């Protein structure tokens, strides 16, 4: 099923980047439906198709082609939107398409959340969708926040509790929080006859907690923690380092935790 990501405003603004699908190509220009503005179309004059000379417009645009264009003029009274394909850098074009695709995914999430409440997508937009876009910048940002921080983060922003609950449920089911990796170091020394075994035991205590241990050069060892929660990763790193140090110190050795090397 195709999802049309919507904007709160009925018409785009001048200077805005829009995504369109070309549906008609003529000798003097092309028409494209605006994917984010239901029922609206834009006109691309042949002079705005490419920065180079355009002998045949069909060498640059074709029916059903997805395009990114910059809005030049908007006339709601006449129903006209004029856009340019040439007044965009390639990196802007790429970012816009990527953002649009992500928002398509978020709109699917919104529909799933609405379904859990027995509502349709139109109702979802009116009751909470546009509000989420105002608060978080876009729909996906709202679902990402819900996945990472829970429904309380939505409720605190004024999102109704019933919507916050289903949005969070859908978000946690479909979005994996990005993984972070943090690194710390322990310098541990043992003066006991069985010092090697003591050091090995200390480092194994960190490995048993799921931490990667790497030798930098005795007496220094690198501890690496991976997690989807930065604060939990920091806590895990410090606790593991402290445990290593305690094991060594208990046997008459010494140790030090270094969060960063200077």
From Swiss-Prot:
The record's disulfide annotation reads: none
Which Gene3D superfamilies does this chain map to?
EIF_2_alpha, Nucleic acid-binding proteins, Translation initiation factor 2, subunit 1, domain 2
Write out the entry's keywords from A to Z: Initiation factor, Protein biosynthesis, RNA-binding
Where do transmembrane segments lie in this chain? none
Question: Pfam families given for it?
Answer: EIF_2_alpha, S1
Q: What does this protein do?
A: eIF-2 functions in the early steps of protein synthesis by forming a ternary complex with GTP and initiator tRNA.
- PANTHER family noted in UniProt: EUKARYOTIC TRANSLATION INITIATION FACTOR 2 SUBUNIT 1
Q: What is this protein called?
A: Translation initiation factor 2 subunit alpha
Organismal lineage: Archaea, Methanobacteriati, Methanobacteriota, Methanomada group, Methanobacteria
The gene name on file is: eif2a
